[in-house]
Amino acid sequence: CLSGASPRVACGLGTVARIVGTGEPIYARKLLFEEARARIESCWRPFHEALAGLIEENLERFGYCLVLDCHSMPTPFSRLSPRPDIILGDAHGASCRPAWSNFLERQFLGQGFSVRRNDPYAGGFITRHYGRPHEAVQVMQIELARGLYMNERQYTRKPGFEAVQALSLIHI
């Protein structure tokens, strides 16, 4: 890790990440400053402007907004046993009211998935930045174990693929 920066940035997990969660580099070479800035201006900034707009639009239209920030995670976890199928991250209650966290957990458990909360993924930038439960903006990060639906070494579908694909927010 680099010194003098935030822990995430210092370790290569800033706005333009240099490594994946296992510590392996994403790029074959160090990005030039202009390349990183171009990615921020062409991808990161427009995405976040659109997300902020959608949140405000939903607040105006419905009086509340639920943001589900969905990710996939590698299956192996040395710290967790048994390995969870799903990790729900609500920034330890700071990004989402407990009622929403409890509801989502019950829905996944009811469909036969094992669930953990906030460990090791409590929520990233989207969860922490946009979650305002006191203002009716509930944000939950959902991590889904890739091993449920794919062979992680060969990148091929597993028999469980269809069951995971059938998950729908409509059913939740």
Predicted features, each with a name:
Residues 40-43, 47-54, 164-168:
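Alpha-helical packing segments of well-folded alpha/beta enzyme cores
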Residues 143-167:
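A hydrophobic, small-residue-rich beta->alpha segment in the mid-to-C-terminal subdomain
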Residues 1-29:
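Short, His- and charge-rich active-site/binding loops that engage polyanionic ligands
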Residues 43, 92, 96, 159-163:
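Alpha-helix N-cap and loop-to-helix initiation/capping positions
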Residues 27-44:
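Surface-exposed cleft-lining segments at the edges of enzyme active sites
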Residues 46-151:
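Catalytic cores of processing enzymes, dominated by hydrolases/peptidases
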Residues 5, 40, 119:
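Glycine- and other small-residue-rich loops at beta-strand/loop junctions that grip anionic moieties
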Residues 170-172:
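Conserved small/polar residues in nucleotide/adenosyl-binding loops
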